[in-house]
Amino acid sequence: MYQIAVCDDEEAIRSQIIRVLSAHPSREAFSIVEFSSGEVLLNSLRAGQAYLLLILDIQLQDQNGVTVGRLLREELGDNATQVLYISAHTQYAMELFDVRPIN
């Protein structure tokens, strides 16, 4: 079983993403871990927790989602975890290329 992390500081958005993921036909193949804080997610990653996929808001209250992705790639050397960014803001689009999110 693989794990998917959902990180958004807005509970309504996290809940909606989790609801959509939970309706997937292969739901029994993965577990969902939710985070309301980029810092808590980073602590989990630094502690060695592995996720197949991070669904990550760009504008978090305590941490920029782009920074979380950059630390995942550069500090932790994790190039295997897929990163899917969600945001209503377009100003970060060019920064995302450095983090290599899902195409």
Place the predicted regions along the sequence by residue.
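Acidic, metal-coordinating helix/loop segments flanking the phosphotransfer/catalytic sites
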Residues: 18, 34-53
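Glycine-rich, flexible loop segments associated with nucleotide phosphate handling
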Residues: 30-35, 80-83
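Two-component/phosphorelay signaling modules centered on CheY-like receiver
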Residues: 11-33
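CheY-like receiver
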Residues: 51-103
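Acidic di-acidic motifs
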Residues: 8-10, 88
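Short, well-ordered amphipathic alpha-helices
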Residues: 14-22, 41, 68-73
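Non-catalytic signal-transmission and effector/linker regions of two-component phosphorelay proteins
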Residues: 1-5
